[in-house]
């Protein structure tokens, strides 16, 4: 098993599947099973998403899979999950597999860190951002959401009542009633990330992206949080639709997936055809 050393001194396991142009995928390569898998299905998520992406891409690409989000949850980085450090971590993964050129695909906050990588290296052969706009990104809204999550995690940690006992059943994609199941340190690291991005000018950053790039989102990707979250709206599709013309002028290929929300647009049946066709037209072995 290959490993890479990350900025905090921890190591992350890496799986490599297939041959061809290298594609970094920050996903869990192993299907999740048991109660956690059932909870994910009820929420509308796929517990085998990473596995499905690998299966759908590894016949055409050298897929480098590593569970970066899972590693951050297992070994939180409450003070050090900064844009520069996450970019350094991604480069460490590429170095560990001997990739001097590679494409990167990430979804949601893992797309965001791909953008941070792209402006810090010339090693990218292509960048695909799903579920997060590369222009006019919701950085302020996400700071409010992650701050609220941290506050609720601290409150839960200070009570005797188990987190699992506090959770009513939720419907798939019901962001207004989403429950906090993470520790204060797990939540704090994302506050650190979005705090560091409050001064980030994603329009000015565009000139530093030198590789082919594509962004996509579901047309219904508008995440409305409830009162305990400050009634925050995290708009993903809005900036992509409104900025479609400008994004294309800046070199982006833009896809809006009709009728899909944040969870639906990340599923393998949506993502694999996009990545296969577009990457095949942009990069060669």
Task: For each feature predicted by the language model, list its residue ranges.
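A short loop-to-beta-strand scaffold at the N-terminal edge of the catalytic core in hydrolase folds
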Residues: 7-17
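Short beta-strand element of the alpha/beta-hydrolase
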Residues: 21-35
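Conserved alpha/beta-hydrolase
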Residues: 44-73
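Conserved acidic catalytic loop of the alpha/beta-hydrolase fold
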Residues: 84-102
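Flexible "cap/lid" loop of the alpha/beta hydrolase fold
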Residues: 112-119, 123, 127-155
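Active-site nucleophile elbow and catalytic-triad environment of alpha/beta-hydrolase enzymes
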Residues: 134, 187-205, 237-242
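Short beta-strand/loop motif that positions the catalytic acidic residue
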Residues: 209, 215-217
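Catalytic active-site module of serine/aspartate enzymes centered on a nucleophile-bearing elbow/loop
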Residues: 241, 248-285
């Amino acid at each position: 098993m290959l490993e890479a050393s990350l900025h905090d001194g921890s190591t992350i396991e890496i799986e490599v599947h297939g041959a061809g142009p290298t594609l970094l995928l920050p996903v869990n390569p192993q299907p999740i099973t048991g109660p956690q898998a059932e909870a994910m299905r009820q929420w509308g998520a796929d517990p085998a998403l990473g596995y499905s992406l690998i299966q759908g891409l590894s016949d055409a690409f050298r897929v480098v899979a590593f569970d970066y989000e899972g590693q951050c949850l297992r070994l939180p980085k409450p003070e050090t999950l900064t844009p520069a450090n996450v970019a350094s971590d991604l480069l460490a993964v590429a170095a560990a597999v001997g990739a001097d050129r590679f494409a990167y695909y990430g979804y949601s906050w893992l797309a965001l860190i791909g953008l941070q990588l792209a402006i810090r290296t010339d090693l990218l052969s292509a960048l695909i951002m799903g579920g997060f706009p590369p222009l006019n990104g919701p950085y302020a809204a996400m700071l409010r959401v992650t701050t609220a999550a941290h506050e609720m995690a601290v409150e839960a940690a200070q009570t005797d009542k188990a987190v699992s006992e506090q959770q009513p059943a939720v419907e798939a994609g019901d962001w207004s009633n989403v429950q906090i199941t993470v520790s204060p340190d797990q939540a704090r690291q994302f506050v650190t990330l979005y705090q560091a991005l409050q001064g980030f000018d994603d329009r000015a950053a565009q000139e530093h992206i030198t590789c082919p790039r594509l962004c996509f989102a579901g047309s219904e990707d508008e995440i409305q949080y409830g009162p305990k979250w400050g009634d925050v709206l995290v708009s993903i599709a809005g900036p992509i639709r409104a900025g479609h013309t400008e994004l294309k002028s800046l070199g982006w290929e833009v896809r809006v997936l009709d009728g899909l929300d944040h969870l639906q647009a990340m599923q393998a049946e949506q993502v694999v055809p996009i990545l296969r066709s577009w990457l095949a037209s942009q990069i060669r072995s």
